[in-house]
């Protein structure tokens, strides 16, 4: 009976981790594709220049693949050490995510102020050598969200030391349109515009976060159940 339970949990554990591993492969693939086609796209922070969408996806994908591989191997081999390692790694990730979420909601105002200050600092790197990713990111954000600057279009005046903005701030794009009168530029601040967009999509973000948490809890349950079954089977055989 104990052996039958172990086999059932084993196959469920393997199937779960196979899907987990394939998900990691997908995330890693998207990250590599972004890195190859978009360069350092979405590198907006001047303090963390390596914190690009591509790099985050590559690191996340590789880590998920590693955890999934450990879980698959632990399930197939019925290895207590690997199962416990998988459980501890997944528990660490779960606790880290929970801590980040709690800190984010607890210090929202401070994070807002720091983010705006850091983004304004990053504006001074716009269009400079070696900052293609940051330049592309600002161009895309200002064009797609129809906004200009971090808190105001005048943020760009400090960057250029003149009354001008990047051409991506223009209502109708044309070469050197950023030198024209302010009436031809987007007036909405990018930080608040993107923040409102995120708030409008908060339900989708919440559902995604909840699904992620449920998957992780399911993985922890499978791992600990199988670990206990392996221990029980070893004790029974002994």
Curated annotation (Swiss-Prot):
Database matches in SUPFAM superfamilies: Tetraspanin
Cite the ranges annotated as topological domain Extracellular. 35-55, 107-201
The record's CDD domains line, in alphabetical order, gives: NET-5_like_LEL (cd03165)
Report membrane topology.
Multi-pass membrane protein
Q: Where in the cell is it found?
A: Membrane
Q: Which keywords has UniProt assigned to this entry?
A: Glycoprotein, Membrane, Transmembrane, Transmembrane helix
Gene Ontology cellular component annotations, sorted alphabetically: plasma membrane
Question: Would the keyword Membrane be found if you checked this record's keyword annotation?
Answer: yes
Membrane-spanning residues where? 14-34, 56-76, 86-106, 202-222
Q: Which domain of life is it from?
A: Eukaryota
- Cytoplasmic-side positions: 1-13, 77-85, 223-238
Q: What is its main location?
A: membrane
SUBUNIT field:
Forms a complex with integrins.
Protein name stated in the entry: Tetraspanin-4
The scientific name of the source species is Pongo abelii (Sumatran orangutan)
